Amino acid sequence: MDEEAAIDRLPLDLLAYIFSLATSFTVLAQASGVCKKWRKAVNQSMARRETLSFAGWKMDDDSTSRLVHLAFNLKELDISRSRWGCHITDNGLYQIASARCVSNLNSVSLWGMTAITDSGVVQLISRTSSLQHLNIGGTFITDESLFAIAERCHQLKTIGMWCCRHVTERGLLVLVNKCRKLESINLWGTRVPVDCFIALLTISPALQIKPMELLLNAQNPPPLLHAV
């Protein structure tokens, strides 16, 4: 009883700090169920977070959205699919898009989220005016998402589109033309022709096209490639 009383006497700010050190969402969920004070402390700890990663966790639309909505000061959000059974859909992106933190996000990773479409991505991107780093590799997005990114994300510096096989030269040209701060783009596994890379470099000569082989193909004729 004395130990419980001592815990109960801990200031709310101290409890929130302790919970901010927790790396397990399961632990935070259990702590929220202890009492109203602990629930408030957990919520306060989430509000302080600037980074949030669900790597290794089995998440769904509701649980992901709930945590993002609590993280008022969030700057970096990683909801990549890193575990079998992790299922986040367009509905989850719709919910996340209404979170207070979204307009301040500078980094978002949706890598491998095969259940999302252009609809969800466009909805989320419509709120991200501060985005600098975006990873949408391993998804089935099309040029529709690229057009939305080009219109909204003028601060964008890096974008990953690994194996995004449905994007075309048209979408990439619009993206690079409008995102003038873009420094790096990963196009491994896409189906765009070498001529597209040449066009991208014409628009932005300093652009880093990854992997390096793509850049070499764009800059050198085939005979020189064999000599390298």
UniProtKB/Swiss-Prot annotation:
Disulfide bonds: none annotated. Pfam families: F-box-like (PF12937), LRR_6 (PF13516). Residues 4-51 form the F-box domain. Transmembrane segments: none annotated. Coiled coil: none annotated. It comes from the Eukaryota. It comes from Arabidopsis thaliana. This is F-box protein At5g67140. InterPro entries: F-box-like_dom_sf, F-box_dom, Leu-rich_rpt, Leu-rich_rpt_Cys-con_subtyp, LRR_dom_sf.
